[in-house]
């Protein structure tokens, strides 16, 4: 069924197909045609949260929390929405999303296009979803990098009451200078500020919402070691490895190899796994890792768990394989 749908969708502009697919999924869900499945096939504890299974949806598919209920019916163990910023922003000019089917890859330079944190919260409040919901937060493009912490703090405060966990996205390649926040001193200052705010909010709301940070695949071992040291010292609750890569050498002479943006899907598989393995070695079990990047079939999810991840997330694989990928991953993890 999905291979036929994919042929039709891949004939459309990538971004238009993205919105069409989500709208269609939402309509089918509202008509009651998606059998809601809990998929408690492999329960796992992540950052103190009880997941029915370890296969989650990565941020980026539902940027504004408009499709939470429909996505929640597909059997994910957890869902992450965003990236969201304090204020609405249009993102980068179109075209900004490209498929590379020969390599099962996707290039995006979306640029955190979203309706803002207030609109997202309204969508969450309308949702009936009762599962584990992560909110991925970022900074507005117009905010100077030296003031980035202000944007993250605004989003953290507003999202706190509505999230099961919150992810600090400092690794998108499509917001100018954002990845500089992965540097030791910059990272330490940002995460310390967020952890202090987290403690205040936990007291106010009477609940503890875990904080994770999402890192890039384009890091050398020294940088990974520095990040591991910082996240352990500030006592982050989790880390997500990885975001998209800016390295498109795997595409060879493909016409899209020169496009700006982050590359995801199969081409990021090895780079993401390398970071995951090194990170797991340096973290030494002090906090859980969510593995994401290049999961195109069930054995890819199982490989990330073997390399040290507690849970995994998928996105690009869904575009190429459809919702059946979730069950395929769960089957592989159950073996």
From Swiss-Prot:
A GO CC term assigned to this protein in UniProt: plasma membrane
Pathway: Pyrimidine metabolism; UMP biosynthesis via de novo pathway; orotate from (S)-dihydroorotate (quinone route): step 1/1
UniProt subcellular location: Cell membrane
Binding site for substrate: 63, 108-112, 169, 174, 243-244
A GO MF term: dihydroorotate dehydrogenase (quinone) activity
A single BP term in Gene Ontology: 'de novo' pyrimidine nucleobase biosynthetic process
Binding site for FMN: 59-63, 83, 136, 169, 214, 242, 265, 294, 315-316
Keywords for this protein: Cell membrane, Flavoprotein, FMN, Membrane, Oxidoreductase, Pyrimidine biosynthesis
Cofactor detail note: Binds 1 FMN per subunit.
Gene3D superfamilies xref list: Aldolase class I (3.20.20.70)
Needed co-factor(s): FMN
InterPro entries in the cross-refs: Aldolase_TIM, DHO_dehydrogenase, Dihydroorotate_DH_1_2, Dihydroorotate_DH_2, Dihydroorotate_DH_cat, Dihydroorotate_DH_CS
EC numbers, comma separated: 1.3.5.2
Reaction equation(s) it catalyzes: (S)-dihydroorotate + a quinone = orotate + a quinol
Membrane topology: Peripheral membrane protein
PANTHER family assigned: DIHYDROOROTATE DEHYDROGENASE (QUINONE), MITOCHONDRIAL (PTHR48109:SF4), DIHYDROOROTATE DEHYDROGENASE (QUINONE), MITOCHONDRIAL-RELATED (PTHR48109)
Task performed by this protein: Catalyzes the conversion of dihydroorotate to orotate with quinone as electron acceptor.
HAMAP family referenced in this protein's UniProt entry, alphabetically: DHO_dh_type2
NCBIfam families for the chain: PRK05286.1-1, PRK05286.1-2, PRK05286.1-4, PRK05286.2-5, pyrD_sub2
Name the UniProt record assigns to this protein: Dihydroorotate dehydrogenase (quinone)
Lineage per the UniProt record: Bacteria, Pseudomonadati, Pseudomonadota, Betaproteobacteria, Neisseriales
């Amino acid at each position: 069924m999905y291979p036929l749908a994919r042929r039709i969708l891949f004939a459309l502009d990538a971004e238009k197909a993205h919105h069409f697919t989500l709208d269609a999924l939402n309509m089918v869900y509202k008509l009651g045609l998606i059998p809601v499945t809990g998929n408690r096939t492999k329960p796992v504890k992540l950052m103190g949260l009880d997941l029915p299974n370890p296969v989650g949806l990565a941020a980026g598919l539902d940027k504004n929390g408009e499709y939470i209920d429909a996505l929640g019916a597909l059997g994910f163990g957890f869902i992450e929405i965003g990236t969201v910023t304090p204020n609405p922003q249009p993102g980068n000019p179109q075209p900004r999303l490209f498929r590379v089917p020969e390599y099962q890859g996707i290039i995006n330079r979306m640029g955190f296009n979203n309706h803002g944190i207030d609109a997202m919260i309204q969508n969450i409040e309308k949702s009936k979803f009762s599962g584990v919901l992560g909110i991925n937060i970022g900074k507005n493009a117009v905010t100077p990098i030296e003031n980035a912490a202000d944007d993250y703090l605004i989003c953290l405060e507003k999202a706190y009451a509505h999230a099961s966990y919150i992810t600090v996205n400092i690794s998108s390649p499509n917001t100018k200078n954002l990845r500089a926040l992965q540097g030791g001193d910059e990272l330490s200052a940002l995460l310390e500020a967020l952890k202090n705010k987290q403690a205040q909010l936990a007291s106010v709301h009477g609940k503890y919402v875990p904080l994770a940070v999402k890192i890039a695949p384009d890091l050398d071992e020294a940088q990974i070691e520095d990040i591991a040291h910082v996240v352990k010292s500030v006592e982050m609750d989790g880390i997500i490895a990885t975001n998209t890569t800016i390295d498109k050498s795997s595409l060879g002479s493909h016409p899209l190899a020169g496009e700006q943006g982050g590359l995801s899907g199969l081409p990021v598989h090895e780079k993401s796994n390398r970071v995951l393995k090194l990170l797991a070695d340096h973290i030494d079990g002090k906090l859980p890792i969510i593995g994401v990047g290049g999961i195109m079939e069930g054995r890819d999810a199982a490989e990330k768990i073997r390399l040290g991840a507690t849970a995994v997330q998928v996105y690009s694989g869904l575009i190429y394989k459809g919702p059946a990928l979730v069950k395929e991953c769960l089957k592989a993890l159950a073996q």
